[in-house]
Amino acid sequence: EVYFRLFSYVRYLNQRNIDPSYTDSFGVERSVQQRQDIQLAKFFSPFAGWFLTPKFRYYLYVWSSNASQGDPAQVVGAGNLSYVFNRFVTVGAGITSLPTVRSTEGQFPYWLGVDGRLIADEFFRGSYTNGVWIKGDLFQKLKYNAMFATNLSILGVSASQIDNKMDTQSFALQWLPTTGEFGLWGTFGDYDYHEKVATRAAVHWSHSLEDKQSQPGTNAIENSQIRLTDGNVIFTPDLFGKGTTVNTVDYKMMSVDGGVKYKGLSLEGEAYWRRLTNFTGVNTGGIADITDTGYQLQSSGMAIKDVLQLYLSGSQIFGRYGDSSEVRVGESWYFTKQRGLRLNTEFIHVNHSPVGYTAYPMPVGANGNIIHVNLEMNF
């Protein structure tokens, strides 16, 4: 059996109202690119199904981030193979998203906005990587996922760059106490229009010993660099002082999320905690452990059932090297009264973003107002 999907969107992006520069926590002034462009931003085509027996599954795809043309991993061919023993146990191997936060549980692209996480989610999460995993139901309304992997983000990273320790682990527990589900693929928002109150609560715990050689490029697709809260990549030479170079760092991260949906309305939140320890490298003995926290909150409502969704979202990040925040207001017009086509408009007011790359609606250091309009196709 073969199942073919196609996802793509055209994006108009206007960053002209953000500041042209910012000063990081070390007093260094850095320039910020103020983009205004139209891009066929992404092309995603998965092939999925089973072979010989419905228990043996494959999920293979081609993924292109056209805003990142010329950058590492602008085009990716990836996927995974799995075997379903029963509803309690599925074992898989290959490339998939680490279950570090809710948005990497596999519901992409069913988010409130188009292909753009809030800055807190983007800052703390892991990404796509090679590994093995086991997942399934512990009980009827309690699901688990455990993955053992090579690093936090493999896309754009050669096998010759990663270490030989397989020292990345990520675990997730998801509880769906009322209805036993939370919409199609666990999507954000309530386009499904639940007639009964749907609820969820989940916890994620992840650990990785990260090496500077195994980090993706700063504009690699699905970039997941380890950054300080001022936006600096932690492996930058001389960042903590002249002659200082971090080679490895221990990353520990936990997130807790919960949400409720009812008749087109949704309220969903997530809290994050990250700790960076055990720095190794040249002159790293004086670097103290780093703890950062943050949260995001997303609310939405179907103003017109099946047609118009409105949403209001926000997030904050708190850390020794600076705090960040944002507010987003948006709408999605499903002009065919189906989920497969929508016209999305989103306004972002951001204060000192510590994350950003070409495929993301804002650059590192963004401070000000951003608007983007997206025509999304997903079938």
Question: Where is each model-derived feature located?
Answer:
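Flexible, glycine-rich linker and terminal segments associated
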Residues: 180-193, 377-379
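Outer-membrane beta-barrel pore domains
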Residues: 17, 32, 193-379
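Acidic surface patches and DE-rich sequence motifs
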Residues: 24
